Amino acid sequence: MTAQLDDLAIELPSWAFGNSGTRFKVFGTPGTPRTVEEKIADAATVHRFTGMAPTVALHIPWDRVDDYAALGAFAAEHGVALGTINSNTFQDDDYKFGSLTHVDKTVRQKAIDHHLACIDIMNQTGSRDLKIWLADGTNYPGQGDIRGRQDRLAESLAAIYQHVGDDQRMVLEYKFFEPAMYMTDVPDWGTSFVQVSALGERAKVCLDTGHHAPGTNIEFIVAQLLRLGKLGSFDFNSRFYADDDLIVGAADPFQLFRIMFEVIRGGGLEGRGERSDGEGGAGSDLALMLDQCHNVEAKIPGQIRSVLNVAEMTARALLVDTDALAAAQEAGDVLGANGILMDAFYTDVRPAVARWRTDRGLPADPMRAFAESGYQDAVSAERVGGTQSSWGA
């Protein structure tokens, strides 16, 4: 089980290390990064203690710099690499009524050009994925032409996709509501799947675990998209009500376990052209990323805890006796099949995962090791003055 954890790599979002909050308040914290370089340094610290977070995702324009080659070199010096490039078409006044779906061709072209600029950044950073999440939608029935907006979205995505390189991908994220309340232009996995399927093999779906209605069977969506070869990436977080962006696994660790079981079942950790059960299929080169906002808790420990939660639920999912499970399923043994799954879920894997870390020269307890490292006190003393990174900065 532990050897298979070597395949687990969790990308960290640069914005998780900046200040964030709610529509009521954004709280500042000592030591918060003021530059993208300081965000990368914090992300590299998470990787140094966990060994499972080798890349950092950037958000444009929040993380815009003049020299991306130099930024990549800075990241490499700190033991990580630059990863997914995330676009932003939700913080400009021109996008009040939409971006890629806007009725005004000039606004649509502005949004398209932003994504082309993101692809240019990818060419400089060596990033594989361009991630698109759109706030586009409407608040009232009749406000917009639902079908017309889908047509414009398809045209805009096609204009972007033709610039995606042979070794690059576009991933389209969906969200069932917010900020739009009546109709969101990419509200569900079906819409994302339809749009990316029309583009080509290098267009995939991004699944954010907090972007579903309560009670949604997310692991079914995972299984289906992996089956179709269209699940490109995850945004991991946790939620109690809506898109809460809490630490992954905090609200429902059993759900995270079930998701990771289907990821493993579909070959999502292998990144090769066949499924782990040997049945063939599209396989996956799946990206696992955190997308969280640490509004009240400390940011670096919050990211460490998140990585540990994914690792531990993955380890539990790897313990499922799949042969016994298949036999019970084929025999119609309802309770037996459920029991096999639950036995794995209830197994305490923390000692085994700790051994995995120590065998690789990592601390057995990353949370404690970070707390004792003095890193937070050091950056709190050093990062005085300037403007702390936050939404839009």
What annotation goes with each model-predicted range?
Residues 8-27, 87-102, 134-140:
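N-terminal small/glycine-rich loop or linker at the start of catalytic domains
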Residues 29-46, 112-120, 215-224:
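Short, acidic/polar
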Residues 16-18, 60-64, 86-91, 134-138, ...:
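Active-site-proximal loop/turn and secondary-structure-junction residues that shape catalytic pockets
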Residues 4, 82, 94-200, 204, ...:
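Active-site acidic/histidine proton-transfer and metal-coordination neighborhood
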Residues 7-17, 60-90:
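Glycine-rich, aromatic-flanked loop segments that form ligand/cofactor-binding clefts
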Residues 3-12, 29-62:
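Catalytic domains of carbohydrate-active enzymes, especially glycoside hydrolases
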Residues 1-17, 24-27, 44, 142, ...:
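Histidine-acidic metal/acid-base catalytic patches
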